[in-house]
Each structure stands twice: as structure tokens, then as C-alpha cells.
């Protein structure tokens, strides 16, 4: 009897999270990660270690003479990773050649341009008619590698971070941290934190834990916050530790560095933050804060005083989002976009005419039935 009363009083809203979980797992997840920093800091090795895959098997390392005049290039690599029935489409954006030239003036401009181009493409797609299948190519996170051999951030590091800190979530990383003693690591971390504050460079901010979070999560969250900038070591090689256990790490004459040992480096904290706990928040900050900031700047540029008279601005304020002019496309892309929209409008018109014909036919059949 009590069970029957319980069933009658149960509506079923408690099952809503299960619906979202099934839908999310079926759809899969997209994540775009940018890696930047000078060559030789272990960026490729760390990425392969983080995701247990080889994204750089076809890479050719240029000779030292070729690096003298090397220019920065943007490379995009994609891989689908499945774990426990959950699929993640990972897109890695690499920046080979960054900081390798003798003259590094404005070498960060291609990176800024690439990030803004992804915002521009998303804004264009979002303002179009076909909004169901928008491909999100925006950069959700940038791992910026800092040399362990300097005394903090170099002028190039500061210039790059200033140029992108309002466009992407920055996570600073000290590469090849096994070159430092523990005391040196902590001193370098504090120096970098002080410089970031002094230069007013905004890096990714961890959201505050809810009061109802369990204590283990709060402890892990505090450890991750204290680890920034993450001092990491990457390796896909399996070696034997002092207890003859197989571990991923690096063997030296003075001992073994274990990649997944929290006493040796911050690799586990970085992977936990990047994948297990804050991946979705990185995407939300990208959309709700960084992209919206770009979108607002685009709209403000259209309504600057002097660009249009007051009447034009009044008219613009009444326009819908789909009517707002977007950044100019190349002519070929514009013609292609127009053809696609014309074809979509034609299909919608045909569907509407078909529905009207069916309604008229049903109405005629109803009138005939009434006459009989």
C-alpha cells in the first residue's frame, strides 16, 4: 500500500539527469586544445602522455639551420578517443616555430588571428539559418609552456600572454620540470605567479566549489589551484622504479622520475583538471565569457558613433541577430553561402507547400464526408 502511494506521488523529475547523460554520451564531446611555447620543452611528449595516444608520429623536426628563418605555423590534428563508452573528439592546435626565429617580433599574431577566426566562423554559423549542426572549432584551452631554465616569464612570454589572455583560457605549464630541484620549482612557480599578477594577465580561474561538494573533491580542487603553474614531466616510456614496478617515467643516472607520481611532478593534477573535473567548465567559459566578449566587440564596432547616423543605429538596434552584418567573407565563400541558403529556403518552401496541399486535401475530404 505504501509502495502504491509512493508511486502515485512520484512524478519522475529525478530521472532528468539520466536523460541528459544518455544524450550527452550518444552525442559525444568536442574539445579543442592549443599548445604553445618554444621548441624543446616537451610539448609533444606531454600531449601524448596526457591522452595516451601518438598525435605526432608523422612530425618531422627541422634542422637547426632551418630554424633561423622559421616562421610560426598553425597545425591542427584531430583524434577520437573512446573510454568506457564515452567518445571525445579531441582537436589539437599546435604552433610549431613559435619563438624559434632570431627575430620573434609579433610572432604571436598568427595565433591571435587563428583564435579570432574560429570566433568569427562560429558567429557566422550561429547567425545563419542552419543552426542545428554548428561545428564548434573555437579554442577551449591553451597550454602555454614556460622554460624551466629562465627566471620566470621572458618578454616573449609576457607579450604572447597579453595578446591572447582575453581570447582563450590560459593554463601555464613549466615544461621539463625534472631539470629543477623541488625548492627551485616552488621558487619559479611563485615568480611566475607574481609576474602574471604584476602584468595583469588573466589565466583560467577555477570555479569555487559548492558548499555541498564532498571533502575529497574540495581537497583535490585546492591541490590543483596550488599547483598552478603546473610543473610537468612527460613520457610514454615504461621503466622500472626502485621497487621494480613498471611505471611511465624517465630514468637518469641519479634515479627515476615517475610521470604519475604527485611527489615528482604535477602531471596527475594537470590531467585531472583538464579531463576529469574542468573540461566542461573550460568550454562554458569559452562560450559564455570569451566568445560573448568577442561578439559584443563586433556589435559595438557596428554601432560606434560616427560610423552611422543616429537613425541607422536605431534601425540596427531593432534588427534580429540574423540580420546583423557579419565580418566580410571572400567572394567565393559568399557565393557558396548564398547558394546554400537559397537551397535551404527552397526546401523549406517545398515542405510548406506540401503541408498546405495536405491540409487542403484533408479539408476537402472532411467537407465531402459532411455532405454525405
UniProtKB/Swiss-Prot annotation:
A GO MF annotation of the entry reads: identical protein binding
Concerning Pfam families, the annotation shows: Septin (PF00735)
- A GO cellular component annotation in the UniProt record: midbody
In the record, Phosphothreonine modifications are located at: 256
The region called G4 motif is annotated at: 175-178
Q: Which SUPFAM superfamilies match?
A: P-loop containing nucleoside triphosphate hydrolases
Q: Which family does it belong to?
A: Belongs to the TRAFAC class TrmE-Era-EngA-EngB-Septin-like GTPase superfamily. Septin GTPase family.
Protein's name according to its UniProt entry? Septin-1
Q: What organism is the protein native to? A: Homo sapiens (Human)
* Annotated gene: SEPTIN1
Amino acid at each position: 500500500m505504501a509502495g502504491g502511494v509512493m508511486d502515485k506521488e512520484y512524478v519522475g523529475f529525478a530521472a532528468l539527469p539520466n536523460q541528459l547523460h544518455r544524450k550527452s554520451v550518444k552525442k559525444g564531446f568536442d574539445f579543442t586544445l592549443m599548445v604553445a611555447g618554444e621548441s624543446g620543452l616537451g610539448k609533444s611528449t606531454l600531449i601524448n602522455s596526457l591522452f595516451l595516444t601518438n598525435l605526432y608520429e608523422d612530425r618531422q623536426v627541422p634542422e637547426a639551420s632551418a630554424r633561423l628563418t622559421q616562421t610560426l605555423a598553425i597545425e591542427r590534428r584531430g583524434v577520437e578517443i573512446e573510454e568506457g563508452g564515452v567518445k571525445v573528439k579531441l582537436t589539437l592546435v599546435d604552433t610549431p616555430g613559435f619563438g624559434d626565429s632570431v627575430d620573434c617580433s609579433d610572432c604571436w599574431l598568427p595565433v591571435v588571428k587563428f583564435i579570432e577566426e574560429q570566433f568569427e566562423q562560429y558567429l557566422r554559423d550561429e547567425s545563419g539559418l542552419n543552426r542545428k549542426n554548428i561545428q564548434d572549432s573555437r579554442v577551449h584551452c591553451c597550454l602555454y609552456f614556460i622554460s624551466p631554465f629562465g627566471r620566470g616569464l621572458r618578454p616573449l612570454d609576457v607579450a604572447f600572454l597579453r595578446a591572447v589572455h582575453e581570447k582563450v583560457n590560459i593554463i601555464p605549464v613549466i615544461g621539463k620540470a625534472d631539470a629543477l630541484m623541488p625548492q627551485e620549482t616552488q621558487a619559479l612557480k611563485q615568480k611566475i605567479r607574481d609576474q602574471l599578477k604584476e602584468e595583469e594577465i588573466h589565466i583560467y580561474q577555477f570555479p569555487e566549489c559548492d558548499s555541498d561538494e564532498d571533502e575529497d573533491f574540495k581537497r583535490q580542487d585546492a591541490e590543483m589551484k596550488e599547483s598552478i603553474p603546473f610543473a610537468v614531466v612527460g613520457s610514454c616510456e615504461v621503466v622500472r622504479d626502485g621497487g621494480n614496478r613498471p611505471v611511465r617515467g624517465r630514468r637518469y643516472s641519479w634515479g627515476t622520475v615517475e610521470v604519475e607520481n604527485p611527489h615528482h611532478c604535477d602531471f596527475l593534477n594537470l590531467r585531472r583538471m583538464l579531463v576529469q573535473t574542468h573540461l566542461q567548465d573550460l568550454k562554458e567559459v569559452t562560450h559564455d565569457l570569451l566568445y560573448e566578449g568577442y561578439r559584443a566587440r563586433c556589435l559595438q564596432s557596428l554601432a560606434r558613433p560616427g560610423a552611422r547616423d543616429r537613425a541607422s543605429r536605431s534601425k540596427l538596434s531593432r534588427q534580429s541577430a540574423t540580420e546583423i552584418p557579419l565580418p566580410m567573407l571572400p567572394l567565393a565563400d559568399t557565393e557558396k553561402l548564398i547558394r546554400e541558403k537559397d537551397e535551404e529556403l527552397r526546401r523549406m518552401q517545398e515542405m510548406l507547400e506540401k503541408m498546405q496541399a495536405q491540409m487542403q486535401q484533408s479539408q476537402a475530404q472532411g467537407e465531402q464526408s459532411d455532405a454525405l
